């Protein structure tokens, strides 16, 4: 299969765009997208946020405004680049509402340093992608695979919507975790994902191993785990890495915490080192 025929790369399209390009959202995702804009010579014309978060603060030199203020200046014929991720229903509804009224894309950027999923990436990995596609056993899985490729290339939300599955369907019919799971949570926050897993296993598990580097989040995780779960539970105040070492960590509290060039020196751990030969059957990373 020629995967390059599925869709045009969002980056190529944005390079050719003559209409104003505005970012919806701030934070790590927007940082990464604007870095690619700089590298590729794509010009952003503004940044807006949901009305309740638009306070006129500066982000990369742009005043963060409401959409209504943005369109009052630039007009309605704009390209909106969604620059953050969410699974909250009300936020997704807002994204879909924007998609219905504007030209909207959500570029896929790597969470950690690495290549973009663009034409060059597809050309380099097309043989691997073909082998993965052929391993899939049913038509629905193959279509989800193709829609994922289409989305990662184009940034079009419709491809994600085509492949959505409700949380109950995912846990009860696809992942189907059971009482014998050895669960490793890399970036455990306050234990929210562990709680979710235990909801679907009726509180049963073989072991839980959780890493969380942020000191405030780890305290909440420890308090919750001590009060609510018993058994083979290992909580480690450390970030997940490919080796055991000390890294600077910007602990801005909660989900915005990240490895940085400056910040608090923080222990990082490789999961293999933490497990020390113990099994892992269910792995969550973020």
Role assignments for model-derived ranges:
Residues 1-24, 28-44, 50-285:
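Phosphate/nucleotide-binding beta-alpha loop and adjacent structural elements of enzyme active sites
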């Amino acid at each position: 299969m020629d995967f390059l025929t599925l869709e045009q790369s969002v980056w190529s399209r944005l390079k050719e765009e003559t209409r104003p390009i505005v970012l919806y959202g701030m934070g790590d995702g927007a940082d990464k997208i604007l870095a690619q804009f700089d590298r590729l010579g794509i010009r952003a014309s503004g940044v807006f946020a949901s009305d309740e978060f638009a306070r006129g603060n500066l982000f990369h030199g742009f005043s963060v405004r409401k959409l209504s203020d943005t369109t009052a200046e630039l007009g309605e014929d704009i390209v909106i680049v969604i620059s953050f991720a969410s699974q909250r229903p009300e936020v997704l509804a807002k994204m879909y509402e924007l998609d219905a009224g504007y030209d909207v894309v959500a570029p896929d950027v790597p969470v950690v340093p690495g290549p973009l999923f663009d034409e060059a990436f597809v050309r380099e990995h097309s043989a691997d992608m073909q082998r993965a596609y052929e391993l899939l056993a049913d038509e629905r899985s193959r279509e989800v695979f193709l829609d994922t490729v289409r989305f990662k290339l184009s940034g079009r939300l419709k491809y994600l919507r085509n492949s959505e599955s409700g949380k109950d369907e995912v846990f009860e019919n696809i992942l189907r975790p059971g009482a014998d799971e050895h669960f490793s949570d890399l970036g455990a926050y306050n234990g929210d994902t562990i709680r979710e897993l235990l909801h679907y296993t009726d509180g049963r598990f073989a072991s839980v191993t959780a890493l969380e580097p942020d000191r405030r989040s780890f305290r909440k995780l420890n308090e919750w785990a001590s009060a609510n779960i018993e058994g083979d539970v290992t909580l480690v105040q450390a970030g997940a890495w490919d080796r055991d070492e000390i890294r600077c960590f910007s602990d801005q509290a909660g989900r915005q915490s990240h490895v940085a060039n400056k910040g608090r020196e923080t222990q990082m751990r490789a999961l293999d080192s933490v497990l020390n030969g113990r099994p892992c059957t269910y792995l969550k990373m973020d």
